[in-house]
């Protein structure tokens, strides 16, 4: 009875802290054009592509964006053009070849990103499009296989983008499998990675709350409270502009 009462109290406090966080810790976004110094013509055309991301016609539009970016010597926008094709097949209507198309363009952006030293696009499409697609489709063993490959690769190369993405993916997979002991491992890894490399702490409160929730699921109320106490240290931390 006491354990149930404690768990209930912690759950109430989790909700309280979610409400306390301004905007639920959404990062303060800056203009992408200003941040990355994107050519105005490219940026305007990219916005048209984004608006049409679910339309079949966007594939040809993104091919055009890629060629425009190539003419400008903008490798980043070339990567964006390819990566956006994974957005199309991820967000667009379901059809028979959807998964194969998503795999194809995930591999395409991975190849381009590796050749041009842009690991953020390499890992983003892999984790947040292909693996997340598998997770949402309940193909959890496939998702776990890909995420484990990503963990091995990113850790061996010491690529922070990859480690962040794969730890987040593995956390979601184990939560979906209701394997909360394993989920706590990756919730903690995300926190440790942020602190070790002094990464942006704007949503570190969220990470501690998620860790606390995982501990609740394993009936470890003391650890849940400890994580919740740690979360309070980062309430109000805003997104830094780099």
How would you label these PLM feature ranges?
Residues 11-22:
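Bacterial N-terminal signal peptides
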Residues 25-242:
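A "functional boundary" signal
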Residues 6-8, 21, 34:
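Generic short amphipathic/hydrophobic targeting helices enriched at N-termini
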Residues 1-13:
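Bacterial N-terminal signal peptides that target proteins for export
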């Amino acid at each position: 009875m006491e354990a149930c009462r404690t768990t209930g109290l912690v759950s109430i406090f989790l909700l309280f802290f979610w409400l306390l966080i301004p905007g639920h810790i959404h990062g303060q976004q800056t203009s992408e054009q200003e941040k990355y110094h994107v050519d105005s013509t490219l940026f305007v055309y990219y916005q048209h592509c984004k608006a049409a991301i679910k339309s079949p016609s966007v594939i040809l539009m993104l091919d055009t964006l890629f060629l425009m970016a190539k003419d400008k010597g903008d490798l980043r926008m070339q990567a964006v053009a390819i990566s956006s094709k994974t957005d199309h097949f991820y967000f667009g209507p379901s059809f028979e070849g959807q998964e194969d198309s998503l795999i194809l363009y995930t591999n395409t952006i991975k190849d381009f990103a590796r050749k041009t030293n842009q690991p953020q696009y390499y890992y983003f499409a892999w984790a947040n499009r292909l693996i997340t697609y598998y997770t949402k489709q309940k193909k959890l063993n496939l998702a776990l296989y890909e995420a484990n490959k990503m963990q091995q690769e990113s850790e061996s190369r010491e690529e922070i983008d990859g480690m962040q993405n794969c730890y987040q993916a593995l956390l979601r997979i184990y939560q979906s499998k209701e394997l909360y002991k394993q989920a706590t491992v990756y919730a903690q890894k995300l926190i440790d990675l942020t602190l070790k490399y002094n990464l942006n702490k704007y949503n570190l409160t969220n990470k501690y709350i998620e860790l606390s929730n995982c501990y609740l699921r394993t009936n470890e109320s003391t650890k849940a409270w400890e994580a919740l106490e740690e979360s309070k240290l980062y309430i109000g931390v805003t997104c830094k502009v780099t």
